[in-house]
Regions:
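Asp-box/BNR beta-propeller blade signature and adjacent active/binding-site loops
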Residues: 1-115
Length: 115
């Protein structure tokens, strides 16, 4: 997991736990290392993370998750159109936006994953 950036943890019911945050990578001279938003799943109460899925491959940060009333997993996060967020103080319009992903309720089923 990328250290130093806010991430989110959410119960999927029973022992199912989800963790969502940027995988991160190398910084550049113009962009930070917050990119590749990942979802990790643990069916053992966060004792081990058995599944992972790339949700968004560009700039991503500050995700928050919740389990909706119909058991779908909702994730809201900051997103950008490049590999990492722009680090300079003067940023162009549209450099960042909020995105929402709604994942199917099956994501919390022990036998299901994205494959």
């Amino acid at each position: 997991f990328e250290s130093g950036c806010h991430a989110s943890v959410c119960s999927g019911g029973g022992n199912m736990v989800f963790y969502c945050g940027p995988k991160g990578g190398a910084k550049s001279s113009t962009h930070d290392n917050r990119y590749e938003l990942m979802l990790y799943r643990s069916p053992t109460g966060a004792q081990g993370w058995t599944r992972s899925q790339l949700l968004y491959d560009l700039a991503a940060g500050y995700p928050d998750m919740t389990l909706l009333g119909d058991r779908r997993l909702a994730i809201v996060f900051e997103a950008g159109p490049e590999k990492g967020f722009i680090t300079r103080s003067s940023r162009p319009a549209g450099w960042m936006r909020l995105d929402v992903l709604i994942l199917p309720r099956e994501v919390a089923d022990y036998g299901y994953w994205f494959e």
